[in-house]
Amino acid sequence: MSAAAGDEIKRVRVDMFTDGACSGNPGPGGWGTILRWGDTEKELWGGETPTTNNRMELMAVIRGLEALRRPVTVTIHTDSRYVHDGITGWIHGWKRNGWKTAAKKPVKNEDLWRRLDAALGTHDISWQWVRGHSGHVENERADELARRGTSEARQGKVDGQSSTIL
């Protein structure tokens, strides 16, 4: 598809709702993601054991972004201050400091932060923090998916619904 000079190619707008869960910390954990564009929704979930709640929060966003096959405009809704503050602020300093914190300590979950940074790729991203467990419908649904992922991780399953879209 080509665009006339000066015209912008319209990107599909996607809303992504994410959550992570962990039973124990560390322990079995799961992540859940809802992708919505137009009248279409896709649910993704999975889990790991052992893991932590922060790793699952990161995985929810990573797997949602990795499911997108082409550049889109995406608003990521997360109840994780760790993910929100990390990607909108802390990561810039970590990268400048060779993936060390301001206290010169290694960044926790560096592997996933690098993966998230790469997954942002060509997407036009905005971040929206939502209060968890406060009745936000999509956040509650993402939490249910994360709990499903935790349950399946206990049973030895890793991914529930995983695919590429758009």
From Swiss-Prot:
Keywords: Cytoplasm, Endonuclease, Hydrolase, Magnesium, Metal-binding, Nuclease. SUPFAM superfamilies: Ribonuclease H-like. Endonuclease that specifically degrades the RNA of RNA-DNA hybrids. GO terms for biological process: DNA replication, removal of RNA primer. Residues 145-166 are annotated as: Disordered. InterPro entries: RNase_H (IPR050092), RNaseH-like_sf (IPR012337), RNaseH_domain (IPR002156), RNaseH_sf (IPR036397), RNaseHI (IPR022892). PROSITE patterns: RNASE_H_1. It is an enzyme of class 3 (hydrolase). It comes from Rhodospirillum rubrum (strain ATCC 11170 / ATH 1.1.1 / DSM 467 / LMG 4362 / NCIMB 8255 / S1). Mg(2+) 1 binds at D19, E57, D79. Monomer. Its EC number is 3.1.26.4. Its cofactor is Mg(2+). This is Ribonuclease H. Residues 10-151 form the RNase H type-1 domain. Signal peptide: none annotated. Belongs to the RNase H family. It comes from the Bacteria.
